């Protein structure tokens, strides 16, 4: 959907739509290089929650993206942040200043950051991959959580959505009684999935690839066509892309990474880190500090930290 007008569609009210102020319990996830102002605003105008991906943006680019999104929609939208980024606090202040409705996090933000956002009216929604993490962020004050199962694209875990989702819902109080809304992610792409998620006790669904393929996505049509031509057996979970389990399309590049040596993978990571540095305006010192923060916040090896440059 395009333009600033609301698209006529049935309203589905859940605890999550009441929390963020939308009409449709669908979340367009913050995908690096994909989720820009146009896609985010189009999702918001259709009644869902659109989320800007900020990890691949400089501070100034993020501010421009927020301003542009506000020009395209008057409806609530969000920004996805890396909780371990060096300037996470400054980016949160930017969101507060511009009246962004939702702060989405790929990793759990610190309790004091959650408190700062909430006291300024933002809804805090971390993504989690285990029931114990959902309980932890709920105790810290998170307003909702996104749960992504193993079917999801991008960074993913080993547990299927059909197993992970009910475990999280049960840990938070059970279907119809969760302490905070739970959004289901991983393998959802249409109304049937939404109905299934609601039946499990979720308050909505989060989708990435489905929104990547829309007309408002900035992804080139040639790339979209590759997605459309692939079948169920054409994705692979690889640790060779960036050192962490990552569901990607099986392409020539991925096959080369899978069959290549670890040394070549590390070399590619350094080269991609240099490209990422140029595209974001970050300095090597800032990249190194982010790497240290990532190491402290996770159990990744140093090889995985360096390899993470393959997919910012």
Q: Which residues does each predicted region cover?
A:
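Active-site entrance/lid segments in N-terminal catalytic domains of soluble metabolic enzymes
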Residues: 1-179
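Conserved active-site-proximal phosphate/metal-binding subdomains
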Residues: 7, 158-181, 189-312
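Thr-Gly-centered strand-to-loop micro-motif
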Residues: 29-30, 52-53, 184-185, 207, ...
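Residue-level detector of alpha-helix initiation sites
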Residues: 34, 187-189
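Short, structured patches in soluble enzyme cores that scaffold and shape functional sites
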Residues: 107, 149, 184-186, 209
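Conserved acidic functional residues
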Residues: 127, 186-187
């Amino acid at each position: 959907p395009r333009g600033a007008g609301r698209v006529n569609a049935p309203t589905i009210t859940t605890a999550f739509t009441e929390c963020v102020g939308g009409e449709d319990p669908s979340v367009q996830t913050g995908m690096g290089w994909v989720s820009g102002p146009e896609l985010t605003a189009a999702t918001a105008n259709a009644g869902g929650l659109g989320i800007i991906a900020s990890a691949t943006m400089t501070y100034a680019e993020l501010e421009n993206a927020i301003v542009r999104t506000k020009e395209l929609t008057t409806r609530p939208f969000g920004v996805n942040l890396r909780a371990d980024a060096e300037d996470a606090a400054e980016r949160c202040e930017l969101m507060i200043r511009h009246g962004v409705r939702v702060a989405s996090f790929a990793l759990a933000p610190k309790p004091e950051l959650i408190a700062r956002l909430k006291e300024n009216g933002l809804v805090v929604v971390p993504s989690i991959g285990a029931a114990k993490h959902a309980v932890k962020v709920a105790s810290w004050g998170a307003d909702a959580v996104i749960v992504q199962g193993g079917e999801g694209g991008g960074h993913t875990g080993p547990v299927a959505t059909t197993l992970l989702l009910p475990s999280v819902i049960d840990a938070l109080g059970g279907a119809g009684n969760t302490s905070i809304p739970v959004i289901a992610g991983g393998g959802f792409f249409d109304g049937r999935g939404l109905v299934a998620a609601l039946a499990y006790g979720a308050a909505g669904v989060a989708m990435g690839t489905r929104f990547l393929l829309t007309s408002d996505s900035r992804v080139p049509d040639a790339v979209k066509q590759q997605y459309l031509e692939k079948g169920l057996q054409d994705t692979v979970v690889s640790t060779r892309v960036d050192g962490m389990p990552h569901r990607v399309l099986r392409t020539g590049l991925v096959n080369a990474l899978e069959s290549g040596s670890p040394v070549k993978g590390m070399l590619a990571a350094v080269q991609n880190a240099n490209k990422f540095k140029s595209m974001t305006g970050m300095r090597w010192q800032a990249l190194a500090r982010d790497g240290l923060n990532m190491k402290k916040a996770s159990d990744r090896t140093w090889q995985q930290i360096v390899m993470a440059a393959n997919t910012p």
